[in-house]
């Protein structure tokens, strides 16, 4: 993802979740995705949607230990 796309997605996530601590960071070796962090902690990955240009998918794992 280029920086313009990262900035747009980051702004959208901050607005949608009402949280200014969300950061979207480029992945140096991956051109089609970016990492998402909350207060410096990795929470998921944003991928460019291959079928829908300009759209993205957010993937977040929730571990059993996180639910305790």
Task: Label each PLM-derived region with a short phrase.
Residues 1-68:
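Terminal leader/tail segments of proteins
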């Amino acid at each position: 993802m280029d920086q313009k796309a990262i900035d747009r997605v980051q702004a959208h996530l901050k607005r949608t979740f009402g949280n200014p601590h969300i950061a979207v960071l480029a992945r140096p070796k991956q051109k089609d995705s970016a990492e998402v962090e909350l207060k410096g902690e990795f929470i998921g990955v944003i991928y460019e949607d291959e079928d829908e240009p300009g759209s993205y998918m957010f993937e977040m794992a929730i571990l059993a230990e996180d639910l305790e």
